[in-house]
Amino acid sequence: DRIRQTYDYCLIDAPAGLGMGFHLASDYADRAVVVTNTDASSLRDAQRTVMELDRLGRGNLHLVVGRVEKKLLRSLHTTIDDAMDAAGLPLLGVVPEDRNVPYALNTGIPLRECSNYAARAYENIARRIMGQRIPLMRI
């Protein structure tokens, strides 16, 4: 309750899987953002996560699809709509594959200073969480 009184938003990065860390994070969530990649394994994990959140009675669920590569989507004959259908969630945002992201993570340099593209995608997602109507980026 102290956190709710102090902050407008508190983001918790729950661990992969549906173990204790996931349940602890979901117990206090007003909203859940399921983050997935476009590969089949990630989409199956997203489906399981959504099913568990539904079972727990959690609402206000959204999807972020990360590490999106246009060429890979074409070669797999998949689309962002396929990811939305698999998860059964509305899309909050798409993050393009960007090799500057690991560089920023490993060096501690803010992503905004390394990559305008991925940083803009994350900023757009944050703005949508705050209720702003921001168009999706073209990948």
Locations of the language-model features?
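Conserved C-terminal guanine-recognition region of P-loop GTPase G domains, centered on the G4
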Residues: L43-L61
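Phosphate-binding/switch loop-helix module in NTP-utilizing enzymes
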Residues: D1-G21
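C-terminal lobe/tail of nucleotide-utilizing enzymes
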Residues: R55-I139
